[in-house]
Design a protein with these regions (language model features):
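Sec-dependent N-terminal signal peptides
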Residues: 4-15
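Outer-membrane beta-barrel "beta-signal"
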Residues: 221-233
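Transmembrane beta-barrel strands of outer-membrane/channel proteins
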Residues: 24-28, 60-64, 93-95, 128-134, ...
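Short glycine/proline- and aromatic-enriched beta-strand/turn motifs that initiate or cap beta-hairpins
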Residues: 18-67
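Solvent-exposed loop/turn segments connecting transmembrane beta-strands
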Residues: 37-41, 65-73, 99-107, 135-147, ...
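Repeated loop/turn-to-beta-strand initiation elements of outer-membrane beta-barrel proteins
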Residues: 55-59, 84-91, 119-126, 156-165, ...
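Membrane-embedded beta-strands of outer-membrane beta-barrel proteins
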Residues: 47, 76-78, 111-113, 150-152, ...
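Outer-membrane beta-barrel transmembrane domain signature
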Residues: 133-200, 206-212, 231-233
């Protein structure tokens, strides 16, 4: 459930040649913040795919948010990395954007560098990305502006691969309505119990500051947990 205001990034970086999964999450955010997040969708379907090749790797995810009557929105992030040498460094390019039933997300393009690594058995993986980020003008009341983004991604399998802990953390410069900058923080750790090699049950917790669009009051920090299932192809 990675956004519907936004978001950047992500992922369960699976350091294999090919990995794909689909997730279904029930979000408790609206139950916790009934005023500030009164319009937050409760159900999100996520599709993720990672594919490595001889030049580097592709990664994308798509989040689709549902209400009882509508498909509320769809948000995607698509990235490509090109390996630089054999020490884990890579060039990183990315596109973020999406649509809702009434509008669209402000699109952005990112370019920068990544440092990726893993343990010998691939049970531990990590990626650190530092990128220039450009937001494109979306509406008459929005502005194109320059930004940056620092992203960390991790994956950890433990308990004889019966459990997985993965997620990402993003730091980027957002822009307020008055044009002043602000630091946006978003992290979405996931904890899964792997019932089989393909089926998992678990949770994702979206923790953010200056990320949720809140017109009810001046609250900026939110913790939104989910209950989810995942199928690994």
């Amino acid at each position: 459930m990675k956004k519907f205001f936004f978001l950047a990034l992500m992922a369960v970086v699976a350091m294999s040649t090919h990995a794909q999964n689909v997730q279904l999450h029930y979000d408790f955010g609206r139950n916790i913040y009934s005023n500030e997040e009164a319009g937050r969708p409760k159900v999100t379907l996520t599709l993720e795919q990672f594919k490595a090749d001889k030049w580097g790797s592709w990664f994308y995810f798509v989040d689709v948010d549902f209400s009882r009557k509508f498909t509320e929105s769809a948000y995607t992030e698509i990235s490509r990395e090109f390996n630089i040498g054999n020490k884990g460094f890579a060039a990183h390019v990315e596109y973020d954007g999406g649509l809702s039933k009434t509008s669209s997300f402000q699109q952005s393009a990112l370019i920068g560098a990544a440092w990726n690594g893993h343990s010998a058995d691939f049970s531990k993986t990590y990626s650190v990305q530092l990128m220039y980020k450009h937001y494109f003008k979306a509406y008459d009341y929005s502005n194109a502006y320059h930004s940056f983004q620092l992203t960390g991604v991790w994956g950890l399998n433990f308990a004889d691969n019966k459990c997985s802990f993965s997620g990402f953390v993003d730091f980027w410069r957002g822009e307020k309505g008055n044009g002043h900058g602000e630091l946006v923080i978003l992290t979405e750790p996931q904890l899964w119990y792997n019932v089989t090699d393909h089926f998992s049950i678990g949770t994702e917790v979206e923790i953010s500051n200056n990320f949720v669009y809140n017109v009810y009051n001046d609250k900026k920090f939110f913790v939104n947990p989910t209950l989810g299932v995942k199928w690994n192809f």
